[in-house]
Every structure is written in C-alpha cells, then in structure tokens.
A protein has these predicted regions:
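PLP-dependent aminotransferase-like
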Residues: 45-106
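A short helix->loop->beta-strand "cap" motif at the edges of active sites that frequently abuts
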Residues: 52, 73, 129-133, 137, ...
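Active-site phosphate-binding strand-loop segment of PLP-dependent enzymes
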Residues: 83-144
C-alpha cells in the first residue's frame, strides 16, 4: 500500500524462510538497501577511514574504488592469475597479513572474470585477521549456486558480510533492492547510516 511507509519485516521474514533449508537466519542478521550499490556505499561510510587499507582484486566491480576514494582509503589489489583468471589466494593471504586491511572486498563470482572462491576458502581468509572485515559480493551467486550463506555461522564468523540483490537473478534492476547478511551487531551498525525508508513499497512487494 503506497499510502503508508514501507515495512521491511515481511521481506525479512521471506528471506529467512528462503534459507531455512540450510540454516535459520534472524531478522536482525539482514539489512535492506536501495540496491547493492547503496549497501556497498553504506559499508564504506561505516567502516572506511582515511589512510586505512582497502584490499580487493583486479579486475573487479568498479564501484568499490570510488567508494574507498571518497573515504580517503588506500587501495591495494591482487591481480588474477593467467588466462583462466585464477584467484591469487597466496598473494591475497600474504597481503592480509602484511597490511592488516580494514576492508576486504571479494566479488564472488567475480565481475568481470567469473572467478569463484569456495565458502571454505573465504572463511579461511576471514580467519587470518579477525579485525579485517571481509565483504563478499554475491550479486551473481545464483548463476553458480554456491552461496556462502549455506554454511556460514555469523556468530562465529562475525567479520564477514554478504551482499546479494535481485537485480541480476530476478530481473528487478530497476526496482533497486539489495540485502546484506551478517552478524547482528554489524547489521545494526550499518543501519545507523541509512534511512529508515530507503527502499520503496513496490520493490519490497516484488
């Protein structure tokens, strides 16, 4: 109904039910955003600070870099390996240890290479430095069907955030609706920099 403000709880309940086959999600482990780009921007606004390190791969989704630049962060990248664009897991791990990045973005599957890391590989990277926040961008996850959501425990892996959206997988790019999944304390913190009604009722209903 467009005469009242949008209500997010029904959508959160749907998302919780959607993943019941793998594990139970709580409403407070889910954030709702006006598209995945808004989620990415909110994460940088919450956790990115001047001169801190932002680690990602090259090439990858282009919106990460301007968000990091707006926060004055220093970007470090690792290039994919060879003609098959293998993930540089050893170099990436070494740079986590050496630079202790504040934010780590992994597009999985990667845009534009299609490179995929397993859930365990991502969890292993997150365990290297517990004070580094790893953001897993899963916008294209439905094309390979291997989401980290199927196995993660946000109480244990509390330095991992997962971003998903309905733009690519459901053909709803024009409605702008994105989600973050993570430890409830992280989600609550990110919600403080977003408006209470950023996502419109049409997008929620869809």
């Amino acid at each position: 109904e467009i005469s009242i403000y949008p209500e997010y709880n029904l959508l959160k309940n749907f998302l919780c039910d959607k993943y019941l086959d793998s594990r139970k999600f709580d409403n407070d482990e889910i954030g709702i955003f006006n598209g995945a780009d808004a989620a990415i921007n909110a994460i940088f606004n919450c956790f990115g600070e001047k001169d801190q390190i932002f680690l990602t791969t090259n090439p990858t989704f282009g919106y990460y870099s301007p968000c990091s630049e707006m926060r004055g962060m220093k970007k470090i990248t690792c290039s994919y390996i060879g003609e098959n664009f293998l993930f540089p897991i050893e170099e990436f791990s070494e740079k986590i240890i050496k630079y202790n990045p504040k934010l780590i973005f992994i597009c999985n599957p990667n845009n534009p290479t299609g490179t995929v890391l397993s859930a365990q590989e991502i969890i292993n990277l997150a365990n290297i430095k517990n004070d580094s926040l790893i953001i897993v961008d899963e916008l294209y996850e439905k094309f390979n069907g291997d989401s980290l959501l199927e196995s993660i425990d946000f109480e244990k892996n509390n330095n991992i955030l997962i971003i998903q959206s309905l733009s690519k997988t459901a053909g709803l790019a024009g409605l702008r609706i994105g989600f973050t999944f993570g430890n409830k304390n992280l989600i609550n913190y990110i919600n403080k920099v977003t408006g209470p009604y950023d996502v419109n009722s049409f997008a929620i209903t869809a």
